[in-house]
Structures are given as structure tokens and as C-alpha cells.
Amino acid sequence: MLDRLARFFTSLRLTVALLACGLVLVFWGTMAQVQVGLYQAQNEFFRSFFIYWSPSETGLRIPIFPGGYLIGGMLLANLVVYNFQFDRPGKRNFGLVLIHIGVGLLLIGQLLTDVFSTESMLHLRNAETKNYSESSTHFELAIVDKTDSATDQVVAIPAEQLQRHGVIRHASLPFTVQVQTFYGNSVLAEKQQAGFAQINVSAGFGAGAWWRELPKEAAMDRRDLPSGIVELLTPQGSLGTFLVSAHLNQPQEFDCNGRHYELLLRLERFYKPFKLHLVEFRHDKYPGTDIPKNFSSRVRVQRPETGEDREVLIYMNNPLRYDGDTYYQASFDPDNHGTILQVVHNPSWLTPYFSCVLVGVGLLVQFLRHLIEFATNRKAS
């Protein structure tokens, strides 16, 4: 049995089949982005073990093709088993072993990036200071205890949890959150329109307004705007039903047990132990044209607990790497008075560099070994 498994995982046919499946997957996933958008295509094709097909109105999910995790995992197993079975380390194949380790590390690094990396955006206006960045696609229901004027106590509930409906409890809250309705993408209207339903809430904003669920956005320059109705419940009774929506920019206020709270559905936040202050944003153009020459943001990094206070210039191809995050110059406001920085947190960002070095050294060692052997044999003859 073990011999059969070893022969299967060391088979060259398996390697070729997996590489062919990888080519099909990349082409298929790239084309699917037109219909479902980049992020959904990544999750369905590349960050999954199988690609599923769902017959209309059945709710079934039938696997029809291997996904990125399965293909990558099988390639890694093929590589590891082959080395243990046939390519045991030695002087003659040291370069080949380095190449295989580099390729394997590249596969593992991609998995670690998918699992642990996060991307967010930091929008700063001139002279503005923030200690958090925001997701560009994911939302959260923030319940903020504003009783203490010096410190806010925040409980954030991911929108994905709201989509499952049910009752949500948290040890820091004297009430529970009952999700009555939640739409992953929606539109609101002040007056009745065709296909819209009336919003029935007893507190906060939205009473008398109308809403409708929308399909998920596929365009890269647009995002889903979720909305829902939640009821806040205490052992003594209901605090009211509230409309929570990404369309609402102002928090809704309420009191419970002598404490003052705010309720807001907002983009997911990633708080930092430091602050970034925008000193100046520059958008330089070539003289006499509208062609951009340079985008740059001069920011001040402030960390009171360590006394750090310094200025850093961020521009294209010159990001700020700080505290495990990388800040790239991504965009800017149309009036040139604000900047948008892309924030990437990737603990395994060095893995591809190590992989390329190992593969390069392995190729060099293998080439030099063959060259020396060829020169020696030719001299001997």
C-alpha cells in the first residue's frame, strides 16, 4: 500500500497533470473575474480545495475541478516525497535539493500569505491623524461605549457573522444583538420605488425609508454596501430595532444601564499602537502637461510610549515598512488635499526572496558541477 502511494506521489505524470490543471485554473479564474469580481474569484478558484458548481435553485455544491489549495498541496507532496524517495541529499545532487527546497518554500509561503496577510487602506486628509486603517471590502458592526470621555470601549462584530443571523452575545455588552434581516449588498431610498420594501424599525435612523437587496458587485471600482435590521435585547426587554447600513455615515445613539452607546456599521478597522499624521501630500506634474510626475506623502510617525516622533516620505516604489506593516502610496483625493495609502500586513513577505535565492544558488551549483565534470572528463580524454 505504501509503495503504491509512493509511486503515485513521485509520478512524473502526476506532476504534469497538476501543472496542466494549474494552467487551466489560472486561465479560468482570470476569466471569472469579469463575472464575479477579483475577490470572489480569488476565494472560489485559488483559495479553495475545489471549484464548486451549484445547479439552479437546488442549493447543492458539486465539486467539478481542483482548486488552488489542492493543486498546490499535491505539488508540494509530489516534491517532498520524490526527494525522500529518490533524491536524498548528497554531493552530486546538492544543487537539485536546493532547487526543490526553494520551490517548496515558495508554495508554503503563498499559503502563509493567504492565511495570515491582510490588506487595508489608510485615508488621510492634510493635517489629519489616525491610528487605524480600514478594509476596502469588509464591514463590521461597531458598538462603542462612549460613557468614559477619555476612552472608547469598542465591540466590533464582523458582517460575516451578521449574515448568519441569530443572536450575538458578548461579555462586554449588557445586551444581546438579534439580527432580524441582513443584506450583503443593498440600496436605500427615501420614497417608495418598484421592488423596494419598507424598513420597519422602532429606534434610530431609517423609519419610513425603503430598501432593496442587490446582487454582489463584480466591478473592481465598486464595493458591496450591506444593510440590516438588528434588535438590542436586555433581560428587562427590548432597547429597540435599529437599521444598520453602510449607507449611514452617522452613528446611532442609545442608553443602557446608565451607559451611553453608539451603533454604526462601518468598514472593518485595524488599530495600530502608533499614529500617522499627514504633513503634506504632493502631486507633481511635468511642466506644461497634465501627466503625473510624482505622488508622495510626507507623514509623521508618532509613538508616545517610546517617544518616537519622526517624518517619513512615502512615494511610488518607496513604501514605509514599520511595525510589521508596509505602507504604499496607492491613490489620492481629487482635490490633492488627501492621500490614500495601501497597508499590507504580511508576516511571510520575505519568503519569496529566500525561495528565489535558494533556487538561484541551486541552479548555479548544479550548473557548475556539470561544467566542472565536463571540463575534467574532456581534459582526461
Q: Over which residues does each language-model region extend?
A:
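Membrane-proximal extracellular juxtamembrane segment immediately upstream
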Residues: A32-T58, I62, V312-F374, R378-S381
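Hydrophobic alpha-helical transmembrane segments
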Residues: T10-V16, N43-Y52, K293-D309
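Internal alpha-helical transmembrane segments
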Residues: R13, P63-D152, V179, I340-R378
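Solvent-exposed, low-complexity, intrinsically disordered
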Residues: L2-F9, F46-F49, W53-S54, R88, ...
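Membrane-embedded alpha-helical segments of integral membrane proteins
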Residues: A17-R88
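Short hydrophobic alpha-helical segments that form membrane-spanning helices or hydrophobic packing faces
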Residues: L18-G22, G109, Q329-F332, G362
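Alpha-helical transmembrane segments and their helix-start/interface "positive-inside/aromatic belt" motifs
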Residues: L2-L23, G95-V103
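Soluble non-transmembrane domains of integral membrane proteins
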Residues: V115-N346
